[in-house]
Amino acid sequence: MSSEQQKLRWGIAWIYSSSNNTIITITDLTGAETVARVSGGQVVRADKDKPSPWAAMQAAYKAAQLALARGINAVHIKVRGPGGYGMKVPGPGASAAIRALARSGLVIGRIEDVTPIPHDIIRPPSGRKGRRV
């Protein structure tokens, strides 16, 4: 099939990548209907391997196969880090997950960073005086 004959069904791939895990969720364009949700902890056995790029790649391949089976063949990617008082950059699995989604046969549209950035001061979870040990 040529590219003009192939009908693209778009979805959104939400990649949340922290220093502890990587979670990939594929939804429809509205974001209301979840098509696939896979995390790094579902594809590895040891807890220490959850944030690794390898686990993120395997999770992205699995999510892409589920999305292709349900008819979504093109995605816009939204990458998110912890944000707030946490890291402002995504974890180690984000770029590996994007690469795996591109290699799995999905058409990639936009890639954007949706990490929540504070516009004022955020009080840390330990409070004003800090953690007293």
Swiss-Prot record:
Pfam families documented for this protein: Ribosomal_S11
InterPro entries on file: Ribosomal_uS11 (IPR001971), Ribosomal_uS11_archaeal (IPR019961), Ribosomal_uS11_CS (IPR018102), Ribosomal_uS11_sf (IPR036967)
UniProt-listed GO biological process terms: translation
Keyword Ribosomal protein: yes
Subunit structure: Part of the 30S ribosomal subunit.
GO terms under cellular component: cytosolic small ribosomal subunit
Name under which the protein is recorded: Small ribosomal subunit protein uS11
Similarity comment: family membership: Belongs to the universal ribosomal protein uS11 family.
